[in-house]
Each structure stands twice: as C-alpha cells, then as structure tokens.
Design a protein with these regions (language model features):
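PLP-dependent amino-acid enzyme catalytic core
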Residues: 1-139
Length: 139
C-alpha cells in the first residue's frame, strides 16, 4: 500500500494510463492525487481484508511520480475483492491475496475501464489458507 507499485509502473510505462485501486476507506493514494497533497488515514479506519493495502499515507515520492500521470483513484469493497479472488482461482487457476486482487476486483465490478490493451496486475499469493477457503465457498 501507499502507491509504490503504481509509481513504479508510471515510471516504467510512461505512456500508460495508471489506475490506482484501493480498498474503501483506505484510499490515501487516490485522495492524495485528488487533493494534490498527502492524505493520512483517519482515526477510525474501516476494517478490510486487504491488509497489504493499509498504509498510514502515501509516500511523498509516490505522489510526486503519480501526480499528473495517474487516473482518478478507484475503491473496491471487500466483497468485490472476494469475488475477484474466486474468479482468479476458478478461471485463471491463480491464488491471489486480497490486496493483490484489488485491480481485478475493480475491473470485474466495472469500476475501472477495460479494453483490448488493458493489463491487470494480479499479485501476491500470500493469503491465509482458512480465509481463502472461506472465500471460495462463499458465493
């Protein structure tokens, strides 16, 4: 969390539209981009299954790289993330941790544009086996 992956993509792929996807209530990068300044998490942030996407704030270097380069931020719900995890497992034979499935969740929920040139990063298999099993059976 904090925009490091998005900033790295922006540097590596300068002619590419970058869509930052974060869990609801933890959209510090998206809000920082919208406000033009660092935004910190509130005193009582909501819970989320996306534990890898829970920064206190974005880093100044990430905001500097992404400013003027990234599209408006997108947020996803835990249920949208679970649906993406199920999709990745059933259709792609991949195990994705919740935070790693956030971009796929945004695409599947219609919150981020998808066309023939879209690349969705599906990262991380570091997920609790019991939680992942519960996600798979919860349809």
């Amino acid at each position: 969390g904090g925009g490091g992956l998005a900033a790295g993509l922006a540097l590596a792929c300068p002619d590419t539209a970058i869509h930052v996807v974060e869990p609801e209530g933890w959209d510090m990068v998206g809000r920082a981009l919208a406000n033009g300044e660092i935004v910190h998490v509130g005193d009582d942030p909501p819970s989320t299954i996306c534990d890898a996407l829970q920064p206190d704030a974005t880093k100044p270097i990430n905001l500097a790289v992404l400013s003027g380069r990234a599209e408006p931020g997108v947020t996803v719900t835990d249920e949208e993330v679970r649906a993406a995890q199920r999709f990745a497992f059933a259709r792609l034979n991949l195990v994705a941790e919740p935070g790693g499935a956030a971009a796929l969740a945004a695409a599947l929920a219609g919150k981020a544009p998808v066309d023939e040139d879209t690349v969705i990063l599906l990262t991380g298999g570091n997920t609790d086996p019991a939680s992942f099993a519960a996600t798979l059976v919860d349809t």
